[in-house]
Structure formats: C-alpha cells, structure tokens
Amino acid sequence: AQITLTNKASYTVTPPAQANAADA
C-alpha cells in the first residue's frame, strides 16, 4: 500500500498482490 503517483509507473515491478491492493 506504498504505491504513490510517482511509483505508479514502477508499481508493475512490485508484487501484483500489493500493486492490486493499492490500485483497488
């Protein structure tokens, strides 16, 4: 849940579960 607008582009590098949770 530490995905920010700046990390939005790098969210793909993070675990899908965490990325999805932050995106949801």
Curated annotation (Swiss-Prot):
GO cellular component terms given for this protein: apoplast
Post-translational changes noted in the entry: Glycosylated.
Superkingdom in the source lineage: Eukaryota
Disulfide bridges in this chain: none
Keyword Disulfide bond: yes
Protein location: Secreted, Extracellular space, Apoplast
Keywords, alphabetical: Apoplast, Disulfide bond, Glycoprotein, Secreted, Stress response
Keyword flag Glycoprotein: yes
Induction pattern: By cold shock.
Family (UniProt): Belongs to the thaumatin family.
Description of how the protein assembles with itself and partners: Homooligomer; disulfide-linked.
Name of the molecule in the record: 33.0 kDa cold shock protein
Natural source organism: Arachis hypogaea
